[in-house]
Amino acid sequence: MLILPIVKGEYKKDYNLKHLTWFKVGGNAEIFFKPLDSEDLKSFLIQNKQKLPIKTFGAGSNIIIRDGGIEGVVIKLGQNFSNIEFIDNHLIVGSSCLNYNLAKFCQANAISGFEFLVGIPGTIGGGVAMNAGAYGSEFKDIVVQIEAIDFAGNFLTFTNEAIGFKYRSNNLPKNLIILKVVFKINKGDSENILLRMNEINNARSSTQPIKERTGGSTFANPEGHKSWELIDKAGLRGYRIGGASMSELHCNFMINNGDATAKDLEDLGDFVRQKVCEDSGVKLEWEIKRIGRHP
């Protein structure tokens, strides 16, 4: 018998995750949990005596939920984890804050260095987790430290150095939930910041299928290469499996054309990896996370 910890937040059983993801595919979460605050989350983790499997969920922008759904508990940090505040010449930002919202906040307050976030879908926590980057900047360039909690309910702090940022990854422990991120502040000019953000938005809209059901870059760029060029060279621009295809506009983006399953998307990605390796000898690595069970 499944016994859930007593919490102040909200549980939902057999919860459909499809509508929360940008791809609009996937199965259900066995248990979906939105904690009220960090203490509520800590209480849940300490009480999790059955050691229910735990997955965290952000904005759903860079993830494929498999069609068989997710066993155990999916934890989503809500609005109570999205605050932005100034403390001692630093920005303290809740991990569920959207990258776009932080970029707009910084522009309004003449804080430079965050312009690139306007072009990165997802949350601050997710951005740290994958060292997201675009247009010449990455999270490693602006993060001072993070505050997190492990699955045993211990609050932990990691400095930039301890995070161990790498290209689209880091050295953080796996069983960790990021709660807050501390950023350094560099003052700038609001008008110049806005101009740069507009440049980034214009570049995105002209080169990426931002109005489609997509999950951002499918594969990380291998050293010395650009994934889209390798995919294009292999003749896979627009290639389709079921309801999923590689974008004609930017062939490192996968698209749900309306009736794709998670299996279609994952099969397409694996096929592209195979063909690129056969064509160029380069092994593409997934940038999009794939989690959950196969049906």
Swiss-Prot record:
GO terms (BP aspect): cell division; cell wall organization; peptidoglycan biosynthetic process; regulation of cell shape
Catalytic residues identified in the record: R168, S217 (proton donor), E287
Keyword Thylakoid: no
Subcellular location: Cytoplasm
Residues covered by the FAD-binding PCMH-type domain: 24-188
Cofactors named for this entry: FAD
GO molecular function: FAD binding; UDP-N-acetylmuramate dehydrogenase activity
Pathway connected to this protein: Cell wall biogenesis; peptidoglycan biosynthesis
Enzyme Commission numbers on file: 1.3.1.98
Function per UniProt: Cell wall formation.
Protein name: UDP-N-acetylenolpyruvoylglucosamine reductase
Organism of this sequence: Rickettsia peacockii (strain Rustic)
